[in-house]
From Swiss-Prot:
Protein name (record): NAD(P)H-quinone oxidoreductase subunit 2
Family the UniProt entry places it in: Belongs to the complex I subunit 2 family.
Organism, scientific name: Prochlorococcus marinus (strain SARG / CCMP1375 / SS120)
Lineage, broadest ranks: Bacteria, Bacillati, Cyanobacteriota, Cyanophyceae, Synechococcales
Keywords: Membrane, NAD, NADP, Plastoquinone, Quinone, Thylakoid, Translocase, Transmembrane, Transmembrane helix, Transport
NCBIfam families in UniProt: NDH_I_N, PRK02504.1
Subunit structure: NDH-1 can be composed of about 15 different subunits; different subcomplexes with different compositions have been identified which probably have different functions.
Transmembrane segments: 29-49, 57-77, 94-114, 124-141, 146-168, 182-202, 223-243, 255-275, 291-311, 317-337, 345-365, 389-409, 424-444, 477-497
Length: 524
């Protein structure tokens, strides 16, 4: 029987059809994804039984599937890495950490979705099934180690995301967002395929490990061209400048719960892909891709936070904010040190809670007013202290104000960057963090400082809270959970630091990269 690490196409070429049937695919490694798939099928089945049955049973089915996936991921922590699908997927600590972020972001996104779907008249079962399909693609992408599995996972995530963006069929802005996302995403997929074909032609393999070895022995200009194509796809997925143009329009036009998932789950999968393919495949071009990522990080932090200053829509402001946040996370990737990788993982976990908490508040406000204009939040503290407090804490955390969770995440990133000599990135990060604090505090000031007579017309006509309505208890629970984690997580951040460090320590790919970097430094 061929080794599990043997490239997929190599095995297919040397084995007969009968032998292929006897190969172990080691489905245990993808058991969490299996539960997500079962939940997806379950939601489709109950949706066939009628809308009322779907509304009743879709939420518990989703909770059971995602909860089971998170529990199994927890049991797999710090275990020996396992390969699946003939070496096309690996379950190590790094993939477990990012798969957990994706699954948890989906769970919270669903908790804040039910009331929104009910009020907009959207079919609940279909929405949940498409979101679970996107989750399945994102989770598989986090552990993919073969060009074929990467492309399949990437397209599963992308196609489901296009459908989610245009889910409000009667809303012209939602349809426009879906079309823009589809066109740009299709171009990114074509660019990735071209880069992947070059890599396969140069190495004769689709395995990232085999490609990395081939490029180290004979780096060529064609490999550098493939790097540019692959990097463009990664930058599109994480919404880095200048591949960010789709982000503001898609975020503004898409349903708000969908935007919440795209801003965290999809972005986390993009960063997992970046590490897998750049660290595992392009070690021979280490200096080149780090230089390119440095430029992307500086542009993303600068443009994202500066343009956010001029926004009047809350969702567009958070769209540009997410571009800036991607720039911060890239600091850890550019460092290429143990502290850098750990800081990147830690910040993605922190970003999960503070960003989804902010979106939960925005959804709650839009459900009552139908608006996402920043000016309409004026004087909100008088009518809704919960949204005011929750949104204020989450925005302060995104800005990096102590003692919020986001502060410790940024400090860890800046510390890792400074220790590695990435002074430009750290300085730009500090300056743009100050800029971001300005527009975050402007929103807080709008909600809190305004006198009663200066409150917006929508706030003056603010309806009474009906917490017993369908979907409202889960929305409140998600909001309180995210706000609590954002506020208290900073004070109790030591377990998160240990978790992020063990994610790096339990990942052979990162340990090999660190060893190579140390040897290179010793020779230099």
């Amino acid at each position: 029987m061929p080794d599990m690490g043997t490239p997929l196409l190599t095995i297919q070429g040397m084995a007969s059809p009968g032998e292929l049937l006897n190969l172990s695919l080691n489905a245990k490694a993808i058991l969490p994804e299996g539960f997500v798939l079962l939940a997806l099928i379950g939601t489709l089945l109950v949706d066939l039984a009628g809308e009322e049955i779907s509304k009743r049973w879709s939420p518990p089915i989703c909770y059971a599937g995602l909860g089971s996936a998170l529990i199994i991921l927890g049991f797999g922590w710090n275990q020996s890495p396992e390969s699946a699908f003939l070496g096309a997927f690996i379950a190590d600590n790094f993939s477990i950490a990012f798969r957990a972020v994706v699954a948890l972001s989906t769970l919270i996104s669903l908790l804040i979705s039910w009331r929104y779907a009910e009020q907009s008249g959207s079919p609940v079962g279909e929405y949940a099934a498409i979101l679970l399909a996107a989750t399945l693609g994102a989770m598989l992408l986090c552990g993919s180690t073969d060009l074929i599995s990467i492309f399949i996972s990437l397209e599963t995530l992308s196609v489901a995301s296009y459908l989610l963006a245009g889910y409000l069929k009667r809303d012209a802005r939602s349809s426009e967002a879906a079309l823009k996302y589809l066109l740009v995403g299709s171009a990114a997929a074509a660019v990735f395929l071209y880069g992947a074909s070059l890599l396969y032609g140069l190495s004769g393999s689709t395995s990232l490990e085999s490609i990395g070895i081939a490029l180290q022995t004979s780096p060529t200009p064609l490999a550098a061209l493939a790097l540019v194509f692959i990097l463009a796809t990664v930058a599109f997925k994480i919404a880095a400048v200048p591949f960010h143009q789709w982000t503001p329009d898609v975020y503004e036009g898409s349903p708000t719960p969908v935007v919440a998932f795209l801003s965290v789950g999809s972005k986390a999968a993009g960063f997992a892909l970046a590490v897998r393919i750049l660290v595992g495949c392009f070690n021979a071009f280490d200096d080149q891709w780090k230089l390119l990522f440095t430029v992307l990080a500086v542009l993303s932090m600068t443009l994202g936070n500066v343009v956010a200053l001029a926004q009047t829509s809350m969702k567009r402001m958070l769209a540009y904010s997410s571009i800036g946040q991607a720039g911060f996370v890239m600091i850890g990737l550019v460092c290429g040190t143990e502290e850098g990788y750990a800081a990147m993982i830690l910040y993605m976990a922190a970003y999960l809670f503070m960003n989804l908490g902010a979106f939960a508040c925005i959804i709650l406000f839009s459900l009552r007013t139908g608006s996402d204009r920043i000016a309409d939040y004026a004087g909100l503290y008088q009518k809704d202290p919960l949204i005011t407090l929750g949104l204020s804490l989450c925005l302060l955390s995104l800005g990096g104000i102590p003692p919020m969770l986001g502060f410790f995440g940024k400090i860890y990133l800046f510390f890792a960057g400074w220790s590695d000599g990435q002074y430009l990135l750290v300085i730009v990060g500090l300056v743009t963090s100050v800029v971001s604090i300005y527009y975050y505090i402007s929103v807080i000031k709008m909600m809190v400082v305004k006198e009663p007579q200066e409150a917006s017309e929508l706030v003056k006509a603010y309806p009474l809270i009906q917490w017993n309505s369908i979907g409202m208890p889960t929305l409140r629970f998600a909001l309180l959970t995210c706000v609590f984690a954002t506020a208290i997580g900073g004070v109790l951040s030591n377990p998160l630091f240990k978790w992020a460090n063990s994610a790096v320590a339990g990942t052979p790919l990162l340990q090999e990269a660190l060893t190579l970097a140390a040897e290179k430094g010793a020779i230099g």
